[in-house]
Design a protein with these regions (language model features):
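Anaerobic metallocofactor- and corrinoid-dependent redox/one-carbon enzyme cores
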Residues: 1-174, 182, 189-453
Length: 453
């Protein structure tokens, strides 16, 4: 394994795989904050060259956190399909990138190969891709999952309806649900971020969400994004269960900072299978985001792209219905501006798909970032072109509870019409019965929530 290269007469030497992975990243403020970013564009190019020549085995055998020290590393390594790995272990990262982008390689071919990849290998591929590569490669890797709706089918584009309220006011939540439904949002999930994380409040909000779902016989699933243990307790006490949610991190220390253990995720999957109102086999929902490990002091000197890929390796083990990166939510300390946020969103999407998970993206930014709503619109169109499974939707994209800017209900409608995409098939049939959609297009009734009153 070579850890050095020569460019224009200058020798660039790296100490280990972790450093090569970090220096090969495109510039982002979080890596600068962590002290792991490339010191120059030349060093970045040199790291990309060294990384391109490394083999899949080189990187698998050198995880950024040792196997003996971290439960996430152990889970990722133990989940590798050894038959697939043996086929590709001598490929260079450049070979793997070319394979993913090759026109003659099918989605099924990639679906087999990705079983043999660890998360560090997945991250390595993203690091040597251009933005167009990230889009083209992501498009080739559909990941389809089933709850009450089917997500990820080619030609579809789904939306999480996000009716957050600063007081968990159930009337406000219901009103936002009706507005979102009138635009065709909500086929991924109707998911509320609660202000108060306790069983009683969670049950009250879930009852509101399912009150709407049941009244209008909507083929979707609900979720209140409290801590996983709160959700489990509420469901055991009789609250209506849809998807069970948890934010995850790419290291054991990061999970502990989130108050999470793998045993909790195991229990959530078991509870969901027993109690939840899900027609399909996928009942979990995870959120992630570049920089989360560093913000928790749990990145172990690794860069934020690699740590994000490890989130997806962890998620893959649980076969969730939904995973999305909340790409700009963590702030400019980690992704400084629209250029860095767009790059991260495209990286996260292809890394999720190459990990075999149902990948969405919250195209978003915080109010102190060097970004604006045009960023969100640019990113959502790029991601929809790349085959992203879903984005978020809320009134005008302004989340007054979480205090950040995301995408609006009408943005999903715009993308669908612009690119000829449709909701999940079960949800589209329901929209047709309500007179909101016909022949894949919104009708004149769309956008008017009064049709539910």
């Amino acid at each position: 394994m070579k850890l050095k290269t020569t460019l224009f007469g200058n020798v660039y030497q790296f100490k280990d795989v972790k450093e090569v992975l970090a220096k090969a990243n495109e510039l982002r403020s979080g890596d600068v904050l962590a002290g792991v970013a490339a010191e120059s564009s030349q060093q970045r190019v040199a790291a990309k060259q060294v990384l391109s020549d490394m083999t899949v085995a080189d990187i698998r055998n050198n995880p950024v956190i040792p196997y003996e020290e971290d439960c996430v590393t152990r889970l990722i390594q133990d989940d590798v399909n050894e038959t697939a790995y043996q086929r590709i272990k001598h490929w260079t990262i450049s070979d793997l990138r070319e394979y993913v982008l090759n026109d003659e390689v099918t989605s099924d071919d990639i679906a087999f190969v990705r079983k043999g990849l660890t998360s560090e290998v997945v991250a390595a591929v993203a690091k040597i891709c251009s933005n167009a590569d990230l889009i083209y490669g992501g498009k080739k890797m559909p990941v389809i999952k089933k709850a009450n709706t089917t997500i990820g089918l080619p030609g579809t584009f789904s939306c999480r309806l996000q009716p957050n309220d600063t007081r968990d006011d159930v009337q406000s939540i219901a009103a936002q649900i009706y507005e979102g439904l009138s635009f065709g949002a909500g086929d991924a999930v109707i998911g509320v971020n609660p202000v108060t994380d306790d069983v009683e409040n969670l049950s009250r909000v879930l009852d509101t969400v399912y009150g709407v779902i049941d009244k209008f016989n909507i083929p979707t699933q609900g979720c209140v994004l409290a801590h996983v243990t709160t959700q489990i307790e509420a469901i055991r006490r009789g609250a209506p269960g849809g998807l069970i949610f948890q934010s995850i991190c790419g290291s054991e220390k990061g999970l502990k900072e989130f108050g999470v253990e793998l045993a909790m995720l195991d229990e959530a999957r078991a509870v969901g299978a027993e109690f939840n109102r899900i027609a399909g086999e996928n009942c979990l929902y995870f959120e992630t985001g570049q920089g989360s490990a560093l913000s928790a002091g749990a990145n172990f000197g690794a860069d934020q792209v690699t740590m994000e890929a490890r989130n997806y390796g962890l998620a893959r083990h649980y076969d969730p219905f939904l995973v999305n990166t909340v790409v700009g939510f963590i702030g400019p300390e980690y992704l400084y501006n629209d250029r860095q946020i767009i790059r991260a969103g495209l990286e996260d999407h292809i890394m999720g798909k190459l990990s075999g998970i149902s990948m969405g993206c919250d195209c978003c930014y915080t109010n102190h970032a060097d970004a604006d709503q045009n960023l969100n619109e640019n990113l959502m169109i790029l991601l929809a072109t790349a085959g992203c499974n879903y984005i978020m939707g809320m009134p005008l994209g302004d989340d007054i509870m979480l205090n950040y800017q995301t995408t609006a209900f009408h943005d999903t409608a715009t993308v669908r019409q612009l690119l000829g995409l449709r909701p999940s098939p079960e949800f589209e049939r329901w929209l047709e019965t309500m007179g909101i959609m016909a022949n894949g297009r919104l009708t004149k009734r769309a956008g008017d929530p009064s049709l539910f009153f």
